[in-house]
């Protein structure tokens, strides 16, 4: 089958160079006569893979020395309860910007008092709250936020300076841009958007914040367990970590975060211009100042054309353009590995579709 234009929301497109290298090394890794998936996680060969991935993360994100880099499992969904289990004392503040922050809040409620510091729910999550709208409280154990909202297509373009440690779910935009790591107490991210295949969850945790963690927790749910064991307390997701390292090799060879950020902005601008210049045929969901550079969400003025759009797009070689099941519409996820050429091709298709169906999709 020929290559497709992959706009899946996650698992998402991976760099072809990383996939081809994995293919080449799949059966016999580094002369061992074994696949990466067959290596002992206690052996020297895997240790080099593990260490390589950690070093790449620290270098590319400019992670300060007082931050621990962990590889966990369970996805961001396990981090939703794990964060409050370890750190929620008197109360925690949650900033709501979409479905994933709502899920994080729901899990935190099992472990203690929570308050909402700001919310975009009343506006159907079309806009990120202004920094000066965020309410903090002296008794906060931490403040939790979600940096990018895949379902609604919104993204924080600046982060709040909070008095309590800031915890952030960066699953869908980590490594898509430069970030001030030292502004956060803890960052977590599932891998399957920008880091590699699913199966591993990256956690960055400041040592000073770690010292506040509760003791007496189940070993597998304690961050301290994985800090002390270098994420080798139990068998890690070896292949996922290996792939993460290959993806970061590609990222570095592509020019690092500055270059990839510029590419991502250019891809997003191309798509948003096509939406804005469609005379109302396409309607963007997110407010302009909150638009995501990772997930471009939009609808058709004539909703009856949505299924037609998806079918014709599929026939033209585009996949993953359906909106999330909870909101419908359309969504183009343009993570790091999605080429600019795919975005150009999508824009051309959108224009052709509009010209073909303009009478049915009357402007609003």
UniProtKB/Swiss-Prot annotation:
Pfam families: Aminotran_5 (PF00266)
E.C. numbers: 2.6.1.52
Cofactor or coenzyme needed: pyridoxal 5'-phosphate
Cofactor note as given: Binds 1 pyridoxal phosphate per subunit.
Keywords assigned by UniProt, alphabetized: Amino-acid biosynthesis, Aminotransferase, Cytoplasm, Pyridoxal phosphate, Serine biosynthesis, Transferase
Biological process terms in GO annotation: L-serine biosynthetic process
Example of a GO cellular component annotation carried by this entry: cytoplasm
Reactions catalysed: O-phospho-L-serine + 2-oxoglutarate = 3-phosphooxypyruvate + L-glutamate; 4-(phosphooxy)-L-threonine + 2-oxoglutarate = (R)-3-hydroxy-2-oxo-4-phosphooxybutanoate + L-glutamate
Taxonomy, superkingdom: Bacteria
Gene Ontology terms for molecular function: O-phospho-L-serine:2-oxoglutarate aminotransferase activity; pyridoxal phosphate binding
Modified residues (N6-(pyridoxal phosphate)lysine): 193
PANTHER family named among the record's database cross-references: PHOSPHOSERINE AMINOTRANSFERASE
Subunit structure, interactors included: Homodimer.
This protein's name: Phosphoserine aminotransferase
Organism from which the protein derives: Shouchella clausii (strain KSM-K16)
Higher taxonomy: Bacteria, Bacillati, Bacillota, Bacilli, Bacillales
